[in-house]
């Protein structure tokens, strides 16, 4: 789960693609 907390908040090594926060 790369998106946690705020909307569109990408953080963490697992989140390589920003698309996951679309």
Swiss-Prot record:
Q: According to its UniProt record, in which tissues is this protein expressed?
A: Expressed by the venom duct.
- Has the keyword Protein transport been applied to this entry? no
Cysteine disulfide links: 2-15, 3-20, 10-21
Sites where Alanine amide occurs are at 22
The entry's keywords: Amidation, Disulfide bond, Ion channel impairing toxin, Neurotoxin, Secreted, Toxin, Voltage-gated sodium channel impairing toxin
Q: Would the keyword Transit peptide be found if you checked this record's keyword annotation?
A: no
The Swiss-Prot or TrEMBL record annotates one GO molecular function as: toxin activity
Superkingdom classification of source: Eukaryota
Report the principal subcellular site.
secreted
Pull one GO CC term from this UniProt entry: extracellular region
Where does this one sit in the cell?
Secreted
| Role this protein plays | Mu-conotoxins block voltage-gated sodium channels (Nav). This synthetic toxin potently blocks rNav1.4/SCN4A (IC(50)= 7 nM). It also moderately blocks rNav1.1/SCN1A (IC(50)=370 nM), rNav1.2/SCN2A (IC(50)=1 uM), and mNav1.6/SCN6A (IC(50)=570 nM). It is noteworthy that coexpression of subunits beta-2 or beta-4 (but not beta-1 or beta-3) decrease by more that 10-fold the binding potency of the toxin to rNav1.6. It is also noteworthy that the toxin is 50-fold more potent on mouse Nav1.6 than on rat Nav1.6.
Q: What family is this? A: Belongs to the conotoxin M superfamily.
**What domain notes does the record hold?**
The cysteine framework is III (CC-C-C-CC).
Further details from the record: Negative results: does not inhibit rNav1.3/SCN3A, rNav1.5/SCN5A, rNav1.7/SCN9A and rNav1.8/SCN10A.
Q: What is this protein called?
A: Mu-conotoxin SxIIIA
- UniProt organism field: Conus striolatus (Cone snail)
